[in-house]
Design a protein with these regions (language model features):
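A beta-rich soluble binding module of mature secreted/lumenal proteins
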Residues: 1-154
Length: 154
């Protein structure tokens, strides 16, 4: 895995639309998937993931957790869900591999490269933009099969 540029949590905060991911058991069939990050007063980051199952307006799935940086560049985080308080101990389970200078897109994974997400601020992107981000995700070490995520309504 490559060394990413430092992350400014304030600029990173906000809503991202999942354009593609290595599907996990809990995300199979999800569409309109988003990840929203906000800063907590204690320095941790609130993580809110949501989407609809199978179709636009389908049953909603959402989960809320928190994350804490585990390195000085804020590129490695430990994320905890289900009330689990994340530890600030490296190596972290969530790595921001790359981001646009304006945080218009981010590519994230875990330290092994077996999971991966392509996230953008825009709900839809062009096929060319998707292919560029997909190629970059592969070059950064994401090994799992990344499949597109359907985003309706844009």
């Amino acid at each position: 895995m490559s060394t990413p540029d430092p992350v400014d949590p304030a600029q990173f905060a906000g809503t991202y639309y999942e354009q593609g991911s290595v599907k996990q058991f809990f995300s199979i069939g999800l569409v309109n998937t988003t990840a929203t990050y906000s800063l907590n007063a204690n320095g941790s980051i609130k993580v809110e993931n949501s989407g609809n199952y199978f179709f636009n307006g389908g049953p909603q799935s959402s989960i809320v957790g928190s994350a804490v940086p585990v390195n000085a560049d804020n590129t490695a985080l430990n994320v905890g869900f289900f009330g689990q308080a994340p530890s600030a101990t490296p190596p972290g389970n969530y790595t921001i591999l790359a981001h646009a200078p304006d945080y218009n897109w981010v590519i994230v994974s875990d330290p092994t490269g077996n999971s991966g997400y392509i996230l953008t601020r825009n709900q839809t992107i062009t096929p060319q933009e998707y292919q560029q981000l997909l190629a970059q995700a592969r070059a950064l070490g994401i090994r799992g099969p990344i499949t597109p995520t359907i985003q309706y309504g844009a």
